[in-house]
From Swiss-Prot:
Gene3D superfamilies: Lipoprotein localisation LolA/LolB/LppX
UniProt xrefs under NCBIfam families: lolB
Residues with a covalently attached lipid (S-diacylglycerol cysteine): C18
Family: Belongs to the LolB family.
Keyword Protein transport: yes
Protein name: Outer-membrane lipoprotein LolB
Lipid attachment, kind N-palmitoyl cysteine: C18
């Protein structure tokens, strides 16, 4: 399973637009009422989905893929990673107390922790438990963060299991209300994860 994504570097072209452009301008205070209002609006999104380009980069492996994220409830979501031909390389479905992962050979795995499972089976320590919040522009459990000049997350730092993740937001889309991220990068020094969202559908 650790070689699940051996063929995916062929998809590197899909990330040509995935370079980050950190928002410039004066930041705003995390104590501002505008930020609290934005957080409240984002937290009210119980169901949403997004798709786009995914990259995982480390000294051990480089993975490029297309991703699809569907949130159907507070603790219910589905993550798909597909190759350039559109075939599913990984399908992960999570709900409270249960996680199911199906690989590209149809093998099914079950566990109770999505983050531990995907790290163990793919060799990619993706912080899924926090990413569920970060992907929509919320800090989650992070307390060290800053805002851009539109009262949205610009960057954050979060230490988990001895690793400090630095998360930067390269932009937001104006196609949704509230505005949602269009470009996110996670970096802990040894690994980088890039997400470029093509679009959002919110309910």
């Amino acid at each position: 399973m650790n070689r699940l994504f051996r063929l995916l570097p062929l998809a590197s072209l899909v990330l040509t637009a995935c370079s980050l452009h950190t928002p410039q301008g004066p930041g705003k205070s995390p104590d501002s009422p505008q930020w609290r209002q934005h957080q409240q609006a984002v937290r009210s999104l119980n169901q949403f989905q997004t798709r786009g380009a995914f990259a995982y980069l480390s000294d051990e492996q480089k993975v490029y893929a297309r991703f699809f994220w569907q949130q159907t409830g507070q603790d219910r979501y589905r993550l798909l990673l597909t190759n350039p031909l559109g075939s599913t390389e990984l399908s992960l479905t999570a709900q409270p107390g249960s996680v199911q992962l199906i690989d590209n050979k149809g093998q099914t795995y079950t566990a109770t922790d999505a983050e531990e499972m995907i790290g163990r089976l793919t060799g990619m320590p993706i912080p899924l438990n926090s990413l569920r919040q970060w992907i929509i522009g919320l800090p989650g459990d992070a307390t060290d963060y800053s805002l851009d000049d539109q009262y949205r997350l610009r960057e954050l730092n979060y230490t988990q299991n001895g690793k400090t993740w630095h998360v930067t937001y390269g932009g937001y889309t104006s196609d949704t209300q509230p505005a949602l991220p269009s470009n996110v990068e996670l970096n802990n020094g040894a690994q980088r994860i890039k997400l470029k969202m093509d679009n959002w559908i919110v309910k």
